[in-house]
Amino acid sequence: RVLAIDANPDRGTLAERVELKSDRTVRDVVKRAGGITSFTLFSDYVSRDKSRLDVLASDTDPMLSEAFDEGDYNVVADIATRYYSICLTDCGTGIVHSVMRAILQRADGLVIVSGGSVDEAKLASETLTWLESNGYGDLVKNSVVALNTATYGTQLVKLDEIENHFKTRVRAVVRVPYDPMLAAGAVIQFDKLHPATRQAARDLAALVVDGLVD
């Protein structure tokens, strides 16, 4: 079983990538943590897509999502690890928010997403530097960079340069080719992605699993 948790403190949109089957959020899990005593009960809080990925949504109210802190995340993660073999956390860009501390302390590895432009790659590289400077150097070494080609016609020479840069800093780099379904920012149907996109996703998933600590 695999669960994706949206812990983005800036109003996450992860749940918008699957067809919602539950209107409950991480806040509901925190409120009712004591009563969630089985996988069946926890399943009421998640949405499951056709690939059998379970997604736990964040709050749509930015004020509530901002208030989701490290203590709340630990409550959710403690419950999730009872019922799932792998827990993925979408933490957005709020790297100094308190929830990030709990996420990073529990993580076995990181996936850093970078766009194909120089500016986007610079921001991703600065994130790696921040992590190294704040005691997470081992996590950086075990990280995978997903080089996301969000716009059609990105220069391959530029992508080669960006990929080579990240290869000096992290364990692996995966290129995710342009795909209109990903670019649309709506519900993602894995079987309708381009074949090259599906293969990139499989490669990324395999690399993440390879990096898990026993």
Name each model feature, range by range:
Residues 57-58, 89-90, 112-116, 144-149:
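Conserved beta-strand segments of the P-loop GTPase G domain that flank and frequently precede/overlap
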Residues 2-54:
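Phosphate-binding loop that captures ATP/GTP phosphates
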